[in-house]
A protein has these predicted regions:
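Conserved alpha/beta-hydrolase "acid-adjacent" motif
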Residues: 218-224
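Conserved HGGG/HGGXW glycine-rich cap/lid loop of the alpha/beta-hydrolase fold
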Residues: 7-64
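Active-site loop/oxyanion-hole signature of alpha/beta-hydrolase fold enzymes
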Residues: 50-90
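Gly/Ala-rich beta-loop-alpha elbow adjacent to hydrolase catalytic centers
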Residues: 91, 95, 99
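Short beta-strand/loop motif that positions the catalytic acidic residue
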Residues: 205, 211-213, 217
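Catalytic active-site module of serine/aspartate enzymes centered on a nucleophile-bearing elbow/loop
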Residues: 235-265
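Flexible "cap/lid" loop of the alpha/beta hydrolase fold
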Residues: 104, 111-142
Length: 265
């Protein structure tokens, strides 16, 4: 199994395809496996590298303080260990936070930036997302991991999605159950994500940027689109209708196409 030791821990990754490097960074409590549709499709044109962040999947899960800066350093260290000096970087949700941090801390390593179902953190974002987390906390109390994974995907996707796509739900739960996330690791990731705030820094990102948002995302509600428009006016923004937070699962083909078109434009 492919690992690289970065910042003193083992980071699991997979790569597929040839061409310009494309790094895929997933979100809170999501292993890299959930990029399965994008890996399969985008590896036809790019060298796709997907990693498990610290605290999830097959990467190490130290019970210590995490931060977006540290997780960005993990991703950058992985790229450097693979001999990659510059890559396109795509991040979903918390992975979007990490991707922003990479673009800000190591701009010379980022060719183009893709931010999916994410925001800039900070008090406004936390307040808008709080109803989702309150619902989640009430719904998962006392539940087993496989039940939690079904519940969170049901709550974060657009209404009716899991009923219409039961096979997608089953596959996502199965992939997550291969390496269930320990509670301490979830708390470490969640806490780190809650402290992220790029609102006063994001204007410094000058790489070509694609922002993809779901109209019905309960974690990063669509009101945050205006924040992006104000602070990243030169970014390309696409809003998916009838789509919630798990865009990589809800609109897999369209997401792959939009990423490909953006990178080839």
């Amino acid at each position: 199994m492919p690992y690289q030791t970065v910042n003193g821990i083992k980071i699991y990754y997979e790569e597929q395809g040839r061409g310009e490097p494309l790094l895929l960074i997933n979100g809170l409590a999501f292993p890299m496996d959930l990029w399965f549709a994008q890996i399969e499709e985008l590896s036809k044109d790019f060298r796709v590298i997907a990693l498990d962040n610290r605290g999830i999947g097959r990467s190490d899960k130290p019970d210590e303080v995490y931060s977006m800066e540290l997780m960005a350093s993990d991703a950058v260290g992985l790229l450097r260990s693979l001999g990659i000096q510059k890559a396109n970087v795509a991040g979903l949700s918390m992975g979007g936070f990490i991707s922003q941090e990479i673009a800000l801390s190591c701009p010379e390593m980022v060719n183009r930036l893709i931010l999916v179902a994410t925001g800039m953190g900070g008090p406004r974002s936390l307040a808008l997302g709080k109803p989702f987390w309150d619902r989640m906390a009430a719904a998962i109390a006392g539940k087993k991991p496989w039940e939690i994974y079904r519940i969170d995907l049901t709550l974060m996707t657009a209404p009716g999605f899991v009923e219409q796509h039961p096979d997608t739900l089953d596959k996502a739960v199965e992939l997550r159950m291969e390496n269930p996330q320990p509670l301490h690791a979830f708390v470490r990731q969640y806490t780190a994500a809650g402290l992220f705030d790029s609102n006063e820094r994001v204007q410094k990102i000058d790489q070509p940027t694609l922002i993809v948002l779901g109209r019905e995302d309960p974690i990063f509600p669509i009101a945050l689109a205006e924040d992006f428009r104000e602070k990243m006016p030169h970014a390309t923004m696409i809003i998916y209708e009838q789509c919630g937070h798990a865009i990589l699962l809800e609109k897999p083909d369209r997401l792959s196409k939009d990423i490909r078109d953006f990178l080839k434009s």
